[in-house]
């Protein structure tokens, strides 16, 4: 995966078990967001592949790809919502899979007594937004909009959740609520991959992968993230630790690096390499 002469991602291999909870950390520009864009096919690979159930994601038909995407829920730092619509409709889009089902949206608009409207209200209440279903999304704060995005995941109930820096622009209360909700979805069976900059949040995950300059340099328990390793991960990052460890503190990651990129997830298996 390249954006210039230097590869944005190189020699990345990740294997994720169904139902696993995984955090991806690294300095700004380490390749975290690029990895997530590749997994959602938002950007094209220059080499390697992404496969679903053994089939290359880049060779699937539009219909087949749509079926895969219905199983994947996404949440981003920049809220992927329609700001002009009420919060409740943005949540409902998680169930209908986009703007295609106008009938479902009209059902919601028909009134607060409809079954869908009640379910949306209950979901928004679960994320701390009771009574906001008919509030225009653009009129909500940034933290509230992120909660709307999480509520949409609750309605969608995806098998795989890809969360790209979901806490970067929200307040501590929202961070805690969003984290708890994502973990609840994970406990209910969803596989959870979260791209993070905050190591303190990453320590709540049983497994952490660290990228630096597009390559994996750590894959394991957060308990093994020593200050020396964190210094190497965040070297040169104004939001991380500037010092780079001495060569003797660097560690062998050959066990975690095979090929160029590979991801395996879910009952059918999702992989990229």
PLM segments and residue spans:
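Conserved ABC ATPase signature
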Residues: 136-140, 144
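Helix-to-loop junction immediately C-terminal to a conserved catalytic motif
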Residues: 40
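Catalytic Walker B motif of ABC-type/P-loop ATPase nucleotide-binding domains
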Residues: 161-164
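Helix N-cap at the start of a conserved alpha-helix in ABC-type nucleotide-binding domains
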Residues: 172-174
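ABC ATPase NBD Q-loop/coupling interface
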Residues: 49-67, 108-110
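A short, proline-enriched helix->beta-strand linker immediately N-terminal to the Walker B motif
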Residues: 155-159
């Amino acid at each position: 995966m390249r954006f210039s002469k230097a590869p944005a991602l190189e020699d990345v291999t990740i294997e994720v078990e169904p139902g696993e909870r995984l955090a991806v950390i690294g300095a700004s520009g380490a390749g975290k967001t690029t990895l997530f864009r590749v997994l959602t096919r938002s950007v094209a690979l220059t080499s390697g592949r992404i496969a679903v159930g053994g089939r290359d994601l880049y060779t699937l038909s539009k219909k087949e790809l749509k079926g895969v995407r219905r199983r994947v829920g996404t949440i981003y730092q920049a809220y992927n919502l329609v700001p002009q619509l009420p919060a409740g409709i943005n949540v409902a889009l998680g169930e209908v899979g986009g703007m295609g089902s106008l009938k479902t949206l009209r059902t919601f608009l028909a009134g607060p007594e409809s079954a869908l409207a009640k379910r949306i209200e209950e979901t928004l209440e679960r994320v701390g937004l009771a009574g906001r279903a008919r509030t225009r999304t653009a009129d909500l704060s940034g933290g509230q909009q992120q909660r709307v995005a999480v509520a949409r995941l609750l309605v969608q109930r995806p098998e795989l959740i890809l969360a790209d820096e979901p806490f970067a622009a929200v307040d501590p209360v929202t961070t805690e609520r969003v984290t708890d909700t994502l973990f609840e979805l994970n406990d209910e069976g969803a596989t959870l991959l979260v791209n993070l900059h905050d190591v303190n949040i990453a320590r709540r995950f049983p497994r952490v992968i660290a990228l630096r300059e597009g390559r994996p340099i750590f894959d394991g328990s957060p308990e093994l993230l020593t200050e020396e390793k964190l210094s190497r991960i965040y070297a040169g990052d104004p939001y991380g630790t500037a010092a780079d460890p001495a060569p003797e503190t660097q560690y062998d990651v050959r066990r975690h690096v095979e090929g160029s990129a590979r991801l395996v997830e879910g009952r059918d298996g999702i992989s990229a390499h």
